[in-house]
């Protein structure tokens, strides 16, 4: 049975709906990125789904289509701010900023996951990137944005292979930390003792 990715957009069809997703909650290095997307119900782009279920090439193509055809915004919270306020609060802050930065004010904000927000417009949907087209589109924009940021940082610190692992705790990344220590972009709040 195929899931209707517009089920939530249809449920709230009388409202301006934005979908939000984040990229970068789990990595050892780099920022967390949240993106918000307001889809145009008269111009549905085919092929949009959870960014993790798409090839890199397909994600790139859809990113270009989404950012060319829909209203969108992105918010980036640095690794240092993550260390100051914790990853959950940093993610929530990024989501709130992404919604606020849209050029149109959403009346309903669909957010992937189970985070709770004080703003009553925010509706958290577990596995939302598999259930809402808006959230799936936002997942693509967030992932591509963060991957590009990590690619840029990788030129400064190639030994951590961020161009390949995006800062996640892969075996090679952990070996690089053991060999070279932490870079200025590593999250100091992460418990590295389990790796080293």
UniProtKB/Swiss-Prot annotation:
Domain RNase H type-2 stretches: 15-196
EC numbers for this chain: 3.1.26.4
GO CC, alphabetical: cytoplasm; ribonuclease H2 complex
Cofactor: Mn(2+); Mg(2+)
Pfam families linked: RNase_HII
Keyword entries, A-Z: Cytoplasm, Endonuclease, Hydrolase, Manganese, Metal-binding, Nuclease
CDD domains: RNase_HII_bacteria_HII_like
Binding-site positions, a divalent metal cation: 21-22, 112
Subcellular location field: Cytoplasm
Top EC category: hydrolase
GO terms classed as biological process: DNA replication, removal of RNA primer; mismatch repair
Catalytic activity: Endonucleolytic cleavage to 5'-phosphomonoester
Domain of life, per lineage: Bacteria
GO molecular function ontology, one term from the record: manganese ion binding
Details of cofactor binding: Manganese or magnesium. Binds 1 divalent metal ion per monomer in the absence of substrate. May bind a second metal ion after substrate binding.
NCBIfam families found in the cross-reference section: PRK00015.1-1, PRK00015.1-3
Family from the record: Belongs to the RNase HII family.
PANTHER family, A to Z: RIBONUCLEASE H2 SUBUNIT A, RIBONUCLEASE HII
Physiological role: Endonuclease that specifically degrades the RNA of RNA-DNA hybrids.
Record-given protein name: Ribonuclease HII
Organism: Rickettsia canadensis (strain McKiel)
């Amino acid at each position: 049975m195929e899931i209707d990715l517009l089920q939530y957009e249809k449920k709230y069809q009388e409202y301006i709906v934005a979908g939000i997703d984040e990229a970068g909650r789990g990595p050892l290095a780099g920022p967390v990125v949240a993106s918000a997307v307001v889809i145009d119900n008269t111009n549905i782009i085919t092929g949009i789904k959870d960014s993790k279920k798409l090839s890199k090439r397909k994600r790139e193509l859809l990113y270009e289509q989404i950012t060319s055809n829909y209203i969108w915004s992105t918010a980036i919270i640095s690794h240092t701010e993550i260390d100051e306020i914790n990853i959950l609060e940093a993610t929530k802050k990024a989501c709130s900023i992404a919604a606020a930065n849209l050029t149109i004010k959403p009346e309903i904000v669909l957010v992937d996951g189970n985070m709770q927000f004080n703003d009553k417009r925010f509706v958290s949907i577990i596995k939302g990137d598999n259930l809402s087209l808006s959230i799936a589109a936002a997942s693509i924009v967030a992932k591509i944005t963060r991957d590009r940021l990590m690619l840029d940082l990788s030129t400064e610190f190639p030994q951590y292979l961020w161009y390949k692992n995006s800062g996640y705790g892969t075996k090679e990344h952990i070996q690089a930390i053991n060999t070279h220590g932490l870079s200025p972009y590593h999250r100091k709040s992460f418990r590295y003792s389990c790796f080293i």
